[in-house]
């Protein structure tokens, strides 16, 4: 069972990619060093980047963010003023005629996240734009 307060952990999860990891593969220095040196590690292989730090943050499990957002909505413990619109709603637009197979082909995971952000922006009075549609 997950805690209803797991949203802050999701927000701080990408911070792990911002800090260097201690490199412990080198032997201890005879002069008195600890043998640990700060360097940026490649998360996939565990080796330092030869050119320095990566220029982009990495989200380790982007699908887990969507699943957790759906669980928070399903639990009914969303705070006042913070509600996500998961899935398409019938508002009379031309996009409601898409079949489920076509929607997955066109949207995918990133398309679904973009729709959620656009829906939240529209509710708050922000502008909206469409990717490659009309």
Curated annotation (Swiss-Prot):
Q: Where in the cell is it found?
A: Secreted
- List residues traversing the bilayer: none
Q: Name one GO cellular component term.
A: extracellular region
InterPro entries assigned to the protein according to its UniProt record, in alphabetical order? P518
Q: Where is the signal peptide?
A: 1-18
**Is this entry keyworded Signal?**
yes
| Prodomain residues | 19-88
What would you give as a GO molecular function for this chain, any one? neuropeptide hormone activity
UniProt-listed GO biological process terms? locomotory behavior; neuropeptide signaling pathway; positive regulation of blood pressure; regulation of feeding behavior
Q: Which Pfam families does the entry mention?
A: RFamide_26RFa
UniProt keyword list: Amidation, Neuropeptide, Secreted, Signal
Q: In which tissues is it expressed?
A: Expressed in the hypothalamus.
> Which residues in this protein are found as Phenylalanine amide?
131
Q: Provide the assembly information.
A: Ligand for the G-protein coupled receptor QRFPR/GPR103.
Homology family: Belongs to the RFamide neuropeptide family.
Q: What does this protein do?
A: Stimulates feeding behavior, metabolic rate and locomotor activity and increases blood pressure. May have orexigenic activity. May promote aldosterone secretion by the adrenal gland.
Q: Under which name does UniProt file this protein?
A: Orexigenic neuropeptide QRFP
Q: Which gene encodes it?
A: QRFP
